[in-house]
Amino acid sequence: MFRKRQTIIISKAGNTLEEMCHDILKQAGGEGLLKIAFFRNAANDSEYLQVLGTLRSTVESFFVTERPLVSYIAQKPGGSTLAAEALYLDDTVANIERHSRYTLLTRGECKEIITEGIVPTDISISAFEQSTEIFSTIGDILQKNGFQPSDIYRQ
């Protein structure tokens, strides 16, 4: 296992989604930041995808290098319009291998994969089809990095 910590961050400034996201990213900083999971209400699937796209593009433009993974949970945060849970790596001897939608941490024989929120390519398909696609994506990531599906310990 690797030493990690989580922090909850609440947007305190901004009127637009981009401004609130920037405020959270400034508060989060960049040192050791592996993943940021945003919380914001969404009225429907279309709004969910729009918000996710905005959050991803804002994070990509904010972090030129070592971009953290991005997840979005469609849930109204208490006391704010946008909140986030930031995951930091405090383990200075870990090797970090960043990929487009996941990060691989290694140190000797120890390996850990951290993923973004994995979203199906089409959220209008049935829940069965969505879950099949998502688990296939997860399986591909695990296989590519020498893991077994039974190695998953937190979803």
Predicted regions and their residues:
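Short, polar/acidic, helix-capping and beta-turn segments at strand->helix junctions
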Residues: M1-Q155
